[in-house]
Amino acid sequence: MPNYAVIDLGSNTIRLVVYEVKDDRRKTYSSKDFKSLINDKVMAGLSAFVADDGTFTDDGVRRAASVLKGHAKRARYFDCKRIDVFATAVLRNAANSAEAVAAIERESGLAINLLSAADEAHLGFVGATCDRTIERGTLVDIGGGSTELTRIEDGRDFDNVSLGQGSLSSYAAFVRAILPTPEEMDAVAGALFERLAALSDRDAYRTDVVVWQSGPQRP
């Protein structure tokens, strides 16, 4: 059975997962078709390498490339058929996005798939519905640098929106110590509510069914 490596290059962590796939010729899968052989993450904190002018710094490029090379080395022990790298908000929103991605690719030797906000939201929906059907509701994916909302109707994903506020960016903007104070938590919530209020189609995401996804929602 072939092995595939996936590397998620996020604002906070860079995660490697190597999957053993029962049959890679199929078009549809459930989680039973995959076996995780390794699940390893590095707290890279890439959002800290975004300068005041919005550019991703050279130090950030070196940090990202170093972690990617380490993950690729581990993946090759498993004789992976492919190694796919996906990047999200931290590089997507950088003022020098294309240049930063190209620099990381040169230094790491790996190609990077830079996901649009819409692609990120859709892939989150695909993962959430791999083993179950969600007929309606709003899928909420809180990452380090952004939050994606996806409207689900009749078991399909429709509208989606990316809010430029995630767990790590909220921490950097509002929290001074290790743990947030009640006032700081109110400030984080207030900033998020302002972003939601600015959405012209915010009513489309109102629902009594909320599906949470990704790390910050885990206990």
Label the predicted regions.
Residues 1-11, 17-139, 150-219:
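Nucleotide/phosphate-binding catalytic cleft detector across ATP-hydrolyzing
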Residues 144-147:
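Active-site-adjacent helix-turn-beta-strand microarchitecture at beta-sheet edges
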